[in-house]
Amino acid sequence: MKQRVAVRERDRLQEKERLRRQRQRAEREARQQASQAEQEAKLAALERHQETGRLTKEEKRYLNKRTRQGAARARTWDLDEDEADEAAALQSQILDRIGSASGAGRVRKQRRARIREALPKASEDRRYAGLTPGLAPVGMSDEESSDEELSDEED
């Protein structure tokens, strides 16, 4: 009798857990569908704004982000030679379209990079050959260090 009650209780709990999982799965799918519909509506509005030339800075940023994500996803695909040629043509077409829009930012970034390359790094300015950060001599033989000590004593 006790075993039968235990089996019923176990079955009841398993059924309850199964129903909970189904409910969670349905809620997750509904959220995904709502999110996807929202994204599609947002993209449609952005496309209309882009066609009319009324994109805000936030919308441009969002479109650039989506473009970068799509490009990253496309790079992960394994392509045949024909597909690679088509992808290269598409890539050049996309770059031609978006290249002129973000030219000022690219020029500014390149100018900053050239300045950084021209300036020496701060950590290299403070380094001395043959010394560790604790100023202990490294890579010098005992003879060299004793010769220096003798010449210092003679002066």
From Swiss-Prot:
<protein>
    <recommendedName>
        <fullName>Regulator of rDNA transcription 14</fullName>
    </recommendedName>
</protein>
<comment type="similarity">
    <text>Belongs to the RRT14 family.</text>
</comment>
<keyword id="KW-0804">Transcription</keyword>
<feature type="compositionally biased region" description="Basic and acidic residues">
    <location>
        <begin position="1"/>
        <end position="31"/>
    </location>
</feature>
<feature type="compositionally biased region" description="Basic and acidic residues">
    <location>
        <begin position="39"/>
        <end position="62"/>
    </location>
</feature>
<dbReference type="Pfam" id="PF17075">
    <property type="entry name" value="RRT14"/>
</dbReference>
<feature type="compositionally biased region" description="Acidic residues">
    <location>
        <begin position="141"/>
        <end position="155"/>
    </location>
</feature>
<dbReference type="InterPro" id="IPR031404">
    <property type="entry name" value="Rrt14"/>
</dbReference>
<feature type="region of interest" description="Disordered">
    <location>
        <begin position="1"/>
        <end position="74"/>
    </location>
</feature>
<feature type="region of interest" description="Disordered">
    <location>
        <begin position="100"/>
        <end position="155"/>
    </location>
</feature>
<feature type="compositionally biased region" description="Basic and acidic residues">
    <location>
        <begin position="115"/>
        <end position="128"/>
    </location>
</feature>
<comment type="function">
    <text>Involved in ribosome biogenesis, probably through modulation of rDNA transcription.</text>
</comment>
<keyword id="KW-0805">Transcription regulation</keyword>
<keyword id="KW-0539">Nucleus</keyword>
<dbReference type="GO" id="GO:0005730">
    <property type="term" value="C:nucleolus"/>
</dbReference>
